[in-house]
Amino acid sequence: MLLHIPAIFTAEEVSRIRAALEQAEWADGKATAGYQSAKAKHNLQLPQDHPLAREIGEAMLQRLWNHPLFMSAALPLKVFPPLFNCYTGGGSFDFHIDNAVRDVHGGRERVRTDLSSTLFFSDPEDYDGGELVIQDTYGLQQVKLPAGDLVLYPGTSLHKVNPVTRGARYASFFWTQSLVREDSQRTLLFEMDQSIQRLTRDVPDHPSLIRLTGTYHNLLRRWSEL
């Protein structure tokens, strides 16, 4: 499942965040890549312990944990602290699959990367190229969203970032360990939950709603891992 979640941040908030990112000191993005990925990765990255990364990352997670669409689709158990990158001057990241497990807090905790997310802090007209290209069931999907918007997709997906030939592309990316490991099961639960919400709005007193809601929770109980 590939899902576009709009307006995590407002235009005014994005403008302030991007201004701060533009003034930050960036490092070589290869530092956080695995052995194979490092050979394909050509970008800049904000150090993970940078105060700005922590500040914006905490604000992002607070928004997302209170966002009904993200919660419904991701069913998050744990989230890897958001990272921040910049592509400019031909920077790119060739096709790769993210590492299956990420260490957090110096290895004291681990996060399984069931879902990948990218939150854009540059508008499409601010740069040329830089599309996030994701290979899914329906072929190659090119993603280039407005600043403040997020795309959520399975961590198992082969993906790349096309070269940025003009301007700069600022974004954040992170991984989520879901209560439900399998993408097909998460997709089914998401579709059920969205249907339940629509029916609750349109026919709130329909007796089948209780049964359908019960079925959703029984499936979640069967498939969830804690």
UniProtKB/Swiss-Prot annotation:
Protein EC? 1.14.11.-
- The Fe2OG dioxygenase domain covers which part of the protein? 78-178
**Cofactors that this protein relies on:** Fe(2+); L-ascorbate
Say which domain of life the source belongs to: Bacteria
Q: Which residues bind Fe cation?
A: 96, 98, 159
Q: Which UniProt keywords apply?
A: Dioxygenase, Iron, Metal-binding, Oxidoreductase, Vitamin C
Q: Which GO terms describe its molecular function?
A: 2-oxoglutarate-dependent dioxygenase activity; iron ion binding; L-ascorbic acid binding
Any one GO BP annotation for this protein: cellular response to iron ion
**SS bond partners:** none
Cofactor binding note of this UniProt entry: Binds 1 Fe(2+) ion per subunit.
Protein residues bound to 2-oxoglutarate = 169
Q: Which Gene3D superfamilies match?
A: q2cbj1_9rhob like domain, Rabenosyn, Rab binding domain
Name of one Pfam family that matches: 2OG-FeII_Oxy_3
HAMAP family registered for this protein in UniProt: Hydroxyl_YbiX (MF_00657)
This chain's protein is named PKHD-type hydroxylase PiuC
Q: Which organism is it from?
A: Pseudomonas aeruginosa (strain ATCC 15692 / DSM 22644 / CIP 104116 / JCM 14847 / LMG 12228 / 1C / PRS 101 / PAO1)
Q: What is the lineage of its organism?
A: Bacteria, Pseudomonadati, Pseudomonadota, Gammaproteobacteria, Pseudomonadales
Quote the gene name from the UniProt entry.
Answer: piuC
